């Protein structure tokens, strides 16, 4: 019978490739016949999809990116628990002995989105897929981070500020809510936060230079920001 740790590793690899699916790029081409990488920030995520392709493509991108992250966790949790030593699903819960295995799967899905092998290891910035995996992992933390994101964006009008706040808040929230969780889980949550912040490095530079674009549901762009 397959060892649950080996199965967790297999699930992580599969999650990486599921997380890597570039829905923003696909939807932009299907609905607008547009490559959203060639305008705005060049990113394949929800915000650039909104700026380049409009609200419909952006909403679908947000939904599908969240879903792909959630699906990775929701499928892996019972699958891993059902094999090997036959331990219960509860052992995969945050703070339980096997929680680190889901942490690895969460991290793999986010890394797949940011380092998509389908796009020569370029991709999005990990916010929507990150929300999906965290909601599926432990929804109260996911909703709290979503609330933090919404408040930060509402105050500043910068999506990147909300994204950075949520990314920094994730490992803090994970450690605060589950102080006795495994070191592996804490490491994975910290790595998700660090990687998302790293993916926003250009946004940080633009914020510091006063050149970051504010959120707009009506303004469209057809040229790259740096042109």
Predicted features along the sequence, with ranges:
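Alpha-helical transmembrane segments of multi-pass membrane proteins
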Residues: 15-18, 77, 108-113, 149-153, ...
């Amino acid at each position: 019978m397959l060892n649950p740790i080996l199965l967790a590793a297999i699930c992580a690899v599969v999650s990486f490739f599921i997380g890597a699916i570039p829905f923003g790029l696909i939807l932009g081409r299907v609905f607008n016949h547009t490559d959203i990488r060639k305008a705005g920030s060049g990113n394949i995520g929800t915000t650039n999809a909104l700026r380049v392709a409009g609200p419909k493509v952006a909403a679908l991108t947000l939904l599908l990116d969240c879903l792909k992250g959630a699906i990775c966790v929701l499928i892996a949790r019972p699958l891993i628990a059902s094999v090997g030593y036959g331990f219960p699903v509860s052992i995969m819960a945050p703070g339980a002995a096997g929680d680190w295995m889901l942490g690895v799967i969460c991290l793999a899905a986010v890394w797949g989105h940011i380092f998509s092998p389908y796009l020569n290891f370029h991709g999005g910035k990990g916010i929507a897929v990150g929300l999906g995996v965290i909601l599926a992992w432990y929804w109260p933390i996911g909703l709290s981070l979503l609330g933090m994101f919404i408040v930060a964006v509402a105050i500043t009008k910068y999506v990147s500020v909300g994204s950075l706040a949520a990314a920094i808040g994730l490992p803090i929230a994970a450690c605060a809510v589950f102080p006795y969780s495994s070191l592996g889980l804490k490491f994975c949550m910290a790595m998700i936060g660090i990687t998302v912040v790293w993916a926003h490095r250009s946004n940080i530079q633009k914020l510091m230079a006063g050149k970051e674009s504010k959120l707009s549901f009506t303004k469209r762009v057809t040229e790259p920001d740096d042109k």
